[in-house]
Swiss-Prot record:
One GO cellular component term noted in the UniProt record for this chain: cytosol
Region described as Disordered: 691-745
Catalysis: reaction(s): RNA(n+1) + phosphate = RNA(n) + a ribonucleoside 5'-diphosphate
Protein name: Polyribonucleotide nucleotidyltransferase
Organism from which the protein derives: Rickettsia massiliae (strain Mtu5)
Organism phylogeny: Bacteria, Pseudomonadati, Pseudomonadota, Alphaproteobacteria, Rickettsiales
MF (Gene Ontology): 3'-5'-RNA exonuclease activity; magnesium ion binding; polyribonucleotide nucleotidyltransferase activity; RNA binding
Protein function: Involved in mRNA degradation. Catalyzes the phosphorolysis of single-stranded polyribonucleotides processively in the 3'- to 5'-direction.
Ranges of Basic and acidic residues composition bias in the record: 707-719
Length: 745
């Protein structure tokens, strides 16, 4: 019944298996990818005919993670997979980028590639399998897919490169890099790095490139046995058509490209296609040429003009040399109500960035095949239509916006402080207000400025730069800080972000074959010099984080309590913690280890919540001094309430150094007095003294001492030995330790 064909290879100690002919047999191409316990189904469907009047290649890639692959039922009301998650969007783009340039340039038939994770093994990088499976399925389909692509993931642990590291290993890795390419050249790189040098990054790319060559071999073997006849393709346009357009319109195109302003240049260039189509209207009606052929020939002429100026004259359309960076302007603190803000402008590209602090309750919850986890740092990239003067409605975040945001996130994440150093969740929003190339790198620069102004103690400022490439034969030019047109007509988009010490993120997309490691080395070094120049300009405005947070930022403090006290703070059904939040206006988050984080809009609210938590969870120690309230006066003494919910007794002899006739002559109900805990009676009730309590210089009112000496009698040391044991088990962090962050002093 099935004519199944299978090819396999042992790759990094595990068997990688590609098979076809059993599942999804009606699709134009279908490959099942297996490695470990991971199983993916990758399918391709190609439309029989191209749509009339289409002027681009309509390739759609959809990567899906089925919940059942990890033995889970989807969350939510409908209990089924729905809108693509950010992770699925990012992997879809990861598949698309190395594959899209490898189709015949004249191919415009609608093509759909679907990669579904059917079984999930956390030891196997399924995004890598998806790229491999998509490439294999395309090689079997009728689509004119010209090269086979494979991919690998590279980590760096203890100075050694690791192929396809597990999720657990990636937690300790200095590098998370994905590289994809053909048997001859690298096509795509995506990475996050912890301040690695250009040499280390290049070696990592080489390592990954060499590692996936055996995979390309089995894709080719599978295609040789199972591929379908490829669609026959003609040239994108007749050579005679291009020559005729050049003869008639080349001077007008050159004049338009000589305009340095993007807005004016685009306006003039946009007038030319209509003139060209009008000239060839009879040929279009007679079906000698199609609109797409004419527009493609015109684009080729525009490309030739731009590329020749660069290669022959070392001159770009805005007048810069290949290494020049556009003029930079930086401004900080322009949004008074935001916790941090910055405006970064580079030429005609501009990003307005804001930083907002939240609590641990504001962290992004992510539900993935690995399980649920939280992201403390969020970065949202927004690309509104007005940034390129387009009259379009604002829509939900596009795939491009998700991808650019993640790239900027990768660039910033390695230099952020950990949660102990900075207890807030952080959201950065970067809105591209103008765009003419490299808006994602403007986002990186603006984010670094906004974070420093907000007072986030980042390790070092970060800047990003986009590099381009123009290559004809052996002649090439690497371009620094590319424009939109240079990206469109060029051969490479190479984005590098990092500090003055090293790289934090790298993304490379190559549109042609034959880009070797020599060119990549030149591009990396040129990017380093450009990055240092940009950092120098940024540092003139702000070079290190502000010492204080914005007055609009929430206040926070933490207190460590005994884990047994957690239930007391929460209360039945959360009653107690809800009441504390309502009374104080603060937000409270309790970790399983007994760390209580309190967040409030001001310090007064913070103190109210802190005092109430301490009253419940903190056990007083002998020798500590508190503010107390006289609750009841007796002939023999008085009952005092302290720490909110604790009561003790002051004997008449402990009220004053001098002899007093009656307690009521000194104390009245409602009086506020300072009291010192001097011990406990045989029933465990607190014994207090007022004598000299207000003169004790060690008094800190409500802040308990963690190292107070225990001078009480044995029967008075109520559970003190138990407390000491608990403290030792918790690295001497006692239940009474309060940490108030320096950012609020």
């Amino acid at each position: 019944m099935f004519n199944e064909i299978t090819k396999s290879v042992t790759w990094n100690g595990k068997v990688l298996e590609l098979s076809t002919g059993k599942i999804a047999r009606q699709a134009d191409g279908a490959v099942t990818v297996k490695m470990g316990n991971s199983v993916l189904l990758c399918t391709v469907v190609v439309a029989n005919k191209a749509k009339e009047g289409i002027g681009f290649f309509p390739l759609t890639i959809n990567y899906r993670e089925m919940a059942y692959a990890a033995g889970k039922i989807p969350g939510g009301f409908f209990k089924r997979e729905g809108k693509a998650s950010d992770r699925e969007v990012l992997v879809s783009r990861l598949i698309d980028r190395p594959i899209r340039p490898l189709f015949h340039p004249a191919f415009v038939n609608e093509t759909h590639v679907t990669c579904s994770v059917l079984s999930y093994d956390p030891e196997i990088p399924v995004d890598i399998l998806a790229i491999i499976g998509a490439s294999a399925a395309l090689s079997l389909s009728p689509a004119p897919y010209l090269e086979m692509v494979a991919a690998s993931k590279v980590g760096l642990i203890n100075g050694e490169f690791v192929l396809n590291p597990t999720l657990e290993l990636l937690k300790t890795s200095q590098l998370d890099l994905v590289v994809a390419g053909t048997s001859d050249s690298v096509m795509m790189v995506e990475s996050e790095a912890h301040l690695l040098s250009e040499e280390q990054m290049l070696e990592a790319v080489k390592f990954g490139f060499e590692s996936f060559q055996p995979v390309i071999k089995i894709i080719k073997e599978l295609a040789e046995e199972a591929k379908k006849p490829k669609l026959e393709m003609q040239d994108l346009y007749p050579a005679s058509l291009k020559k005729e357009i050049e003869k008639l319109f080349v001077k007008e195109i050159e004049q338009a490209f000589a305009i340095k302003s993007k807005q004016e240049r685009s306006t003039n260039l946009d007038l030319i296609p209509e003139k060209v189509l009008t000239h060839f209207v009879s040929d279009i009606e007679n079906k000698k040429y199609s609109n797409y052929q004419i527009e493609s020939a015109l684009k080729a002429i525009e490309s030739d003009i731009l590329r020749n100026e660069i290669l022959e004259k070392n001159r770009r359309i805005d007048g810069r040399s290949t290494t020049d960076i556009r003029q930079i302007a930086c401004e900080i603190g322009l949004l008074p109500s935001a916790h941090g803000s910055a405006l970064f402008t580079r030429g005609e590209t501009q990003s307005l960035v804001s930083t907002t602090f939240g609590t641990s309750l504001d962290e992004q919850i992510v539900d993935s095949l690995e399980g649920e986890y939280k992201e403390r740092f969020m970065l949202n990239y927004i690309f509104p239509p007005y940034s390129v003067n387009e009259a379009m409605p604002m829509k939900v975040p596009s795939r491009r916006e998700v991808g650019h945001g993640k790239l900027a996130w990768r660039a910033i994440n390695p230099i952020l402080p950990n949660k102990v150093q900075f207890p807030y969740s952080i959201r950065v929003v970067a809105e591209t207000t103008e765009s003419n190339g490299s808006s994602s790198m403007a986002t990186v620069c603006g984010s670094s400025l906004a974070l420093m102004y907000a007072g986030v103690p980042i390790k070092a400022p970060v800047a990003g730069i986009a590099m381009g490439l123009v290559k004809e034969g052996k002649k090439f030019a690497v371009l620094s800080d590319i424009l939109g047109d240079e990206d469109y007509f060029g051969d490479m988009d190479f984005k590098v972000a990092g500090t003055s010490e090293g790289i934090t993120a790298l993304q490379m997309d190559i549109k042609i074959s034959g880009v070797d490691f020599k060119i990549m080395k030149v591009a990396l070094e040129q990017a380093r010099l450009g990055r240092l120049h940009i950092l120098e300009q940024m540092n003139k405005v702000i070079s290190k984080p502000n010492n204080e947070l914005s007055k609009n930022a929430p206040s926070t403090t933490t207190i460590k309590i005994d884990k047994d006290k957690i239930r007391d703070i929460i209360g039945p059904g959360g009653k107690v913690i809800k009441e504390i939040c309502e009374i104080s206006g603060a937000k409270i988050d309790i970790s399983d280890d007994g760390t209580v984080s309190i967040y409030a809009s001001d310090r007064d609210k913070l103190k109210v919540a802190l005092d109430k938590i301490k009253a419940i969870a903190v056990e007083p120690e002998i020798g500590e001094i508190f503010n107390g309230t006289v609750m009841k006066v007796l002939d023999s003494g008085a009952f005092i309430n302290y720490l909110g919910n604790k009561d003790g007794f002051v004997h008449i002899s402990e009220i004053s150094e001098e002899r007093i006739e009656t307690v009521s002559s000194v104390l009245k109900q409602g009086d506020i007095v300072k009291v010192k805990l001097i011990g406990f009676d045989n029933k465990g009730k607190a014994k207090l003294t007022i004598k000299n309590a207000d003169k004790d210089k060690s008094s800190n009112n409500t802040k308990p001492k963690t190292n107070a000496k225990d001078n009480s009698e044995p029967e008075q040391r109520r559970d003190s030995s138990k407390k000491r044991a608990w403290n030792e088990d918790n690295n001497a962090e006692t239940a009474e330790v309060i940490t108030e962050r320096k950012y609020f002093n």
